[in-house]
Structure formats: structure tokens, C-alpha cells
Regions:
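Structural signature of hydrophobic alpha-helical transmembrane segments
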Residues: 97-108, 146-152, 258
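C-terminal ends of transmembrane helices
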Residues: 112-123, 160-169, 268-275
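Conserved small/polar residues in nucleotide/adenosyl-binding loops
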Residues: 296-303
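Alpha-helical transmembrane segments in multi-pass membrane proteins
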Residues: 63-68, 104-116, 134-135, 139, ...
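A generic, well-ordered mixed alpha/beta core segment in the N-terminal half of proteins
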Residues: 130-201
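Long hydrophobic alpha-helical segments that form multi-pass transmembrane helix bundles
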Residues: 170-265
């Protein structure tokens, strides 16, 4: 790291006032502060004094997302080989999922960070760090079969209209990742819902592929529950076999890339709580609000609830 620090110090004058690369100063500053703690100090009063900066916080959130991301990659491969009825080892399933998910991560970061680079240059400001998290969240909350060009359009829309128009990181009133999903759902509903978007059945670089098994269904567990006939109590996997509660807890079910595993998501939550990045009160409030609304919905048919 010392050698890298010395190299950055050597080329830094080129990006300062009067340097031949001054036009790209915001890009250099963003890269430098991502690698090292900035040596700048506040010019006015601040609310909190701490040794950690925003980039370190965002980096910790990215680390917390890794368990769900890695499991999501494995599950993409698992669902694929289950659908085509082929035997495959852990490594082959993971590689298939990795190759299916990686392009979405690349598109998300290239489009989102590209827009942020342009805005930073235009406003002559340092590149903001918020998209470090959003760029990873966006591909994790979409189906594996979501086309790359649609993902690029949705990412651009969310970065511009849900973030930059409000002033950037810390000033936006909407979450860019959630706006991306909302945009996709309303603009391209057939790419975000139904039975055909959650499981990849194509071959990737010669890995996998083939005819799907008889009884194949790509519906999610919630989708099956919503459309089940009255009295039906059994949910099924993509190959037609009954799904167990353990499958749902572990996350071996169809769904968005990073949403299926309760265990992986809980591990990420533990990381955030342990590092002090997240508050247990905020997490508890989310579940409390969800339970309260669900209870209200269950009682909505009662006459007294409609007075």
C-alpha cells in the first residue's frame, strides 16, 4: 500500500490546479479517497466527529451484501440445473450463476458510475460514493432473465431522476435501487413478473442448457401462493417436486438474484449491526411496520374495519 500511496502522490500534481490533467481532478480525488482516508478537514462546524468517512461506510455495506450476492449466484445455477434436469456439482452451479450475474453488475456500475463521473466533472465536484452500494443492489433485486439493455435504461433513470436532480448522495429522497425496480416493474412488467423471468434456462459459454423437465414451473413461492386454488397447501420447486420450508429459509427457490436466502441476508444484517453501520431500531421498525400492515390486511374483510 505504501508503494501505491507514493505513486498517487507522484501523479497527483497533474490533477491539481494548473496540471495537464486538471479536468479529471474529480475522478482522481474519488479514486484516491476510495483507497485511502482523505487528509482534508472540515471548514465549518460538523454534527459528528469520527475517524470513518462515507466511503468506508459504503464499503462496509458492500461487504455485508456479499453473502447474499454469492449465494444468489449459486442459486441461479442451482435453479438452472434443476430446471433442465441435469446433474452438476457445486462449482459448476456457481460458475453458471456467476457468468449470468456478472454482466448485470458490470452494466449497473458502468452506467451508474459513468453518469456520476459526468455529473461530477460538470459540477467540478468530487465523485460521490453512494453508488458503490446502489450499483451492487440493483442487479441483486432483479430477475436473472432481465435484459441488460433494460437494466441499463432503468439504472440511468434512477441515477438521474432519483439522485442527481436532488443534489446527489445524502440529498436524494428516494432510494435509487428501489426506484430502479419500480421503473422496471411499471415500464417493463413482463420482464419483472410472471413465470418466465426467474429461472435461466439457456446455456452460457457452453455450460448448462437443454430441454426443461416435465412439470417445470418458474413461478416464485409467493406467485404460487397468490394463484393457488382454494385449499391448496403445497408449493413446488421448478422441477415439480414439493418445496420444503428449509428450501425457503436457505433460499433454494426462484426469485430475484439476491432476495431468496434468509440466512445470507441475516448474515449481512449481523455484519452491519456488528460494525455499527446499521441500527437495530431501524431494522426492527421495518419488521414491525410490515407485521402491522399485514395484520390490518388480514382483518380488512371484517365489517367493523370498513366503518
Amino acid at each position: 500500500m505504501k508503494a501505491l500511496r507514493n505513486y498517487l502522490d507522484k501523479i497527483k500534481p497533474n490533477f491539481e490546479e494548473g496540471g495537464k490533467l486538471h479536468a479529471f481532478r474529480s475522478v482522481f480525488d474519488g479514486f484516491e479517497t476510495f483507497l485511502f482516508v482523505p487528509n482534508s478537514t472540515s471548514k465549518t462546524g460538523v454534527h459528528i466527529h469520527d475517524a470513518i468517512d462515507s466511503k468506508r461506510i459504503m464499503s462496509m455495506v458492500v461487504i455485508a451484501l456479499i453473502p447474499a450476492l454469492l449465494f444468489g449466484m449459486y442459486n441461479v445455477g442451482y435453479q438452472h440445473f434443476l430446471a433442465v434436469g441435469q446433474e452438476a456439482g457445486f462449482f459448476e452451479k456457481f460458475i453458471y450463476g456467476f457468468l449470468a450475474v456478472l454482466p448485470k453488475i458490470i452494466v449497473s456500475y458502468v452506467v451508474g458510475l459513468g453518469i456520476e463521473f459526468v455529473v461530477a466533472q460538470w459540477k467540478n465536484e468530487e465523485i460521490q460514493e453512494g453508488f458503490l452500494v446502489s450499483g451492487l443492489l440493483i442487479p441483486m433485486i432483479v430477475p436473472v432473465e432481465c435484459p441488460l439493455w433494460i437494466l441499463a435504461v432503468a439504472t440511468a433513470f434512477s441515477v438521474i431522476f432519483a439522485k442527481e436532480v436532488f443534489g446527489g448522495t445524502g440529498m436524494n429522497i428516494f432510494n435509487p435501487a428501489l426506484i430502479t425496480r419500480a421503473f422496471l416493474f411499471f415500464a417493463y412488467p413482463t420482464k419483472m413478473s410472471g413465470d418466465a423471468v426467474w429461472v435461466s434456462t439457456d446455456s452460457i459459454f457452453g455450460i448448462g442448457g437443454g430441454q426443461v423437465v416435465d412439470g417445470f414451473t418458474g413461478a416464485t413461492m409467493l406467485g404460487q401462493a397468490a394463484t393457488a386454488a382454494p385449499g391448496a397447501s403445497e408449493l413446488i420447486n421448478v422441477n415439480g417436486t414439493p418445496a420444503t420450508m428449509w428450501d425457503m429459509v436457505v433460499g433454494l427457490i426462484p426469485g430475484s438474484i439476491g432476495e431468496t436466502s434468509v440466512i445470507a441476508i441475516a448474515l449481512g444484517a449481523i455484519i452491519l449491526l456488528w460494525t455499527g453501520v446499521a441500527s437495530w431500531k431501524t431494522m426492527f421498525s421495518v419488521f414491525a411496520g410490515g407485521i402491522a400492515v399485514s395484520y390490518t390486511h388480514l382483518r380488512a374483510h371484517e365489517t367493523l374495519m370498513n366503518l
